């Protein structure tokens, strides 16, 4: 059950609690291995952590195209939604780019200064595909890079068994967690492949985890070195992005996903509970948090969470997140709620209130 706390019971460390101590040592070894052994290291970690350890990494463009065509045929509404999302994101990113004014000025006689905004040559995108492949991440990372005019967009995403290899893998009882199918063709989640094709990314590598981040940061025989790496991931991906910062640029150290909802009694407890669970189902260490001044409302949301967990298909993951990392915090005022939000600086901030 989600914890209900008074404001004075919240530990100060919680506000800055993106702690990757247990992951740092692991990723340092991964980075060292990738630098020294390149593709061989990527294959070693793929065989250890993924359901597939392909013989090579670059997914054929024909497979990307086929995935997009399959999505259009089998799930036309989803296909249209991805296309529309790409269109909207491209418009917004293009407007952002236009807002960066280039200029030159003579600040003193004979002394000229200025500003010129240019895209990086090669951007690396990481798209998770663990419990839930994140098609939306493709749109939110690839599309801005395309709008910015990046010459080459490289994507890494965890491997899957290629359709051509599925019968062989199934016959051998392979291609499942703990029993990877090795040596097949590179492939990935079909939704991610389809979205990559729709958004214009044609270089997709079947490589996941911290080893993919290290591969993009330092380059291997197969994966080119990039200038900047963007995209979310688990704590090992986040720790690796933090470790390679300086060698390459990064967007941010995101860590486990989180939502922070400021709500009052005018909100529907069922809706608030659903939003908390929508984040909780991502990861067992996701942080679903609600802040309110009304303890009665907090208890109604807590009860609604328990009710919805009974029928949630992702309840196993969501339950662990809610019990271990979930919080409902009772504050004295909305001003204190805003203060907590500013201190936490969450990935997702939601206001569910009348005013």
What function would you assign to each model-found segment?
Residues 1-121:
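N-terminal Rossmann-like NAD(P)+-binding subdomain of aldehyde/semialdehyde dehydrogenases
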Residues 3-7, 203-208, 328-333:
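Short acidic-hydrophobic, aromatic-tinged amphipathic segments that line or gate anion-handling sites
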Residues 60-76, 253-259, 282-298, 303-330:
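Flexible, acidic loop-helix segments that line cofactor/substrate-binding pockets
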Residues 105-192:
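Conserved small-residue-rich beta-alpha loop and adjacent elements
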Residues 136, 146-165, 183-187, 263-271, ...:
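Glycine-rich phosphate/diphosphate-binding loop of Rossmann-like nucleotide-binding domains
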Residues 174, 197-287:
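Conserved NAD(P)+-binding/catalytic subdomain of aldehyde/semialdehyde dehydrogenases
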Residues 322-355:
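Conserved C-terminal structural/oligomerization subdomain of aldehyde/semialdehyde dehydrogenase
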